[in-house]
Amino acid sequence: CAASIYGANLVTNRADSPHLSAKNITGEMYFACAEIDPYAPKETIDQLQDQLQQTDIKYRLEWYPGAEHGFAFPDRGEIYHKASAERHWERLHALLDRNLSI
């Protein structure tokens, strides 16, 4: 399994852009996307989701309305978005619990 907090640089103009390898993913994926994120704008995340939908990957891509890049970490000051952070950490822990034998 794998998770992406914010989704930065998952879609680029390069020939080796990560989203182009989505068909090779075998594990469950989780993507947490901030609504306000200059590093992963909606258009970029939409391209990622389009690519993911063409595969059989089990994934969850969630938007966090009103949240900015860095929302999940309390030490980010005003950027920290408590409600979104709590939901994000619940989703991430659930992903890890489902997929990792500890």
Model-predicted segments: where are they?
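Alpha-helical scaffolding within the catalytic cores
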Residues: L10-L20
